[in-house]
Every structure is written in C-alpha cells, then in structure tokens.
C-alpha cells in the first residue's frame, strides 16, 4: 500500500497541473466488465504530464495503481434509491477506499437527503475521526455546500456537482462564479465539472484554485466526438 500523502505535499504536487478523471460506467462505450481500459487512460494521462488521476471503483483504482504512482482521487459510485447522492455515499464505500492507500477520497457533500438520513456535517466529522490521516474532498454544487463541508473539516472542496443538482446553477461550461467565490473564501478548491477547453482551464487556474480535474474533455471520446459533430450541425 502506498504511503499516505500529506496535505501540503498533495497541494504542491497538483499546483498548476491537471488531474485527469478516468472513468467509465456500465453502458458506456469504454466500460469493460473485465477491466483493463482505465489504466490505459491513466497511463496516457501520465505520459501527457497529468499530476493526478480521479477514478471510480476499487477495481479500476487497483488497476491504475499498478501502472502509475500518480496521486489518485478515488470514489465509488453506487446508487441508493430513492436518495440521489451516489458518489461515495456511505461509510461502506469510504471503508473500501481507505484500504487502498489513495491520496484523496471524494464524496457527495451536497445538501440532498442522504441514505443514512444524517446531516452531511456529521458524516464528515465521523470519517475524519475514523481516518484522521486520510485526505477527503467534498463534491458540492453550491457555495453554501462548499463552505459547510470545509467548516466541518473537509480538506478540499470540488465543484464537481454544480449543474448536477436541481437547485444549482445550470450552464454549459464550468461554474466560474462558484469557483471564484470559494477561492475568495480561502478554501482549497479543486475545480471540476464541464471544463471543455484548455482556455477554460487556464482561466480557472488564474482564479487561485488548488487543482483542476478534467474528465469528459479528455477521456470520454463519445462526448468529444459529439461536441464536434454538434458544432458542424449547428
């Protein structure tokens, strides 16, 4: 198992760089029941100069760890209907990820009702008590959610879910306003969500973020192709 990385070291490693999200869910073209695809994506990202990887599932994370030493932000996506949160939604997923020795565990920290019925602040405090040396990232959709998670003890706040909750800003590109507001509050922000172009990434970096995660624009060829095709048709 890799040594735990300190918050300071992680922040230094990801500064002015790109973390690449390498994920594919069942039903998507790059998903393979046998695995083996995401580590190829991760290796390509590393060769391009990526400073980290975001990955989903124990299987994919282990396969990625076998091919790269880049720090990993890990999640487990699992539905708990009728509740909406599905990104590392319960302690069971946190426990599985903690065993992998990854740099950061990310989890849904929105205000939506949770499967366990508990306020998210209570859950954050519990996971920090249980795993005091583990870094955690809050996936949020609004400024209030980010502030609440940070005040509860979360290490990093990600703008991952802006536009993916019914009450958050709905827009085509990244939520620059949310990113700027969180940075101005002095919160370590990992910008993520609908960052489609290098220019957008550069603009976000200039806002003073701790890090940037890019997924669909790099590792989802179906989405990338669709964007080009739509541009020609429009």
Curated annotation (Swiss-Prot):
Pfam families associated with the record: NanE
GO cellular component: cytosol
Keywords: Carbohydrate metabolism, Isomerase
Catalytic activity: an N-acyl-D-glucosamine 6-phosphate = an N-acyl-D-mannosamine 6-phosphate
Pathway linked to the protein: Amino-sugar metabolism; N-acetylneuraminate degradation; D-fructose 6-phosphate from N-acetylneuraminate: step 3/5
InterPro entries: Aldolase_TIM, NanE, RibuloseP-bd_barrel
Family matches, as SUPFAM superfamilies: Ribulose-phoshate binding barrel (SSF51366)
Domain of life: Bacteria
Keyword presence, Transmembrane: no
E.C. code: 5.1.3.9
An example molecular function term from Gene Ontology annotations: N-acylglucosamine-6-phosphate 2-epimerase activity
GO BP of this protein: carbohydrate metabolic process; N-acetylmannosamine catabolic process; N-acetylneuraminate catabolic process
HAMAP family registered for this protein in UniProt: ManNAc6P_epimer
Protein's job: Converts N-acetylmannosamine-6-phosphate (ManNAc-6-P) to N-acetylglucosamine-6-phosphate (GlcNAc-6-P).
PANTHER family (alphabetical): N-ACETYLMANNOSAMINE-6-PHOSPHATE 2-EPIMERASE-RELATED
Family listed: Belongs to the NanE family.
Name by which UniProt lists this protein: Putative N-acetylmannosamine-6-phosphate 2-epimerase
The species this protein was found in: Streptococcus uberis (strain ATCC BAA-854 / 0140J)
Lineage: Bacteria, Bacillati, Bacillota, Bacilli, Lactobacillales
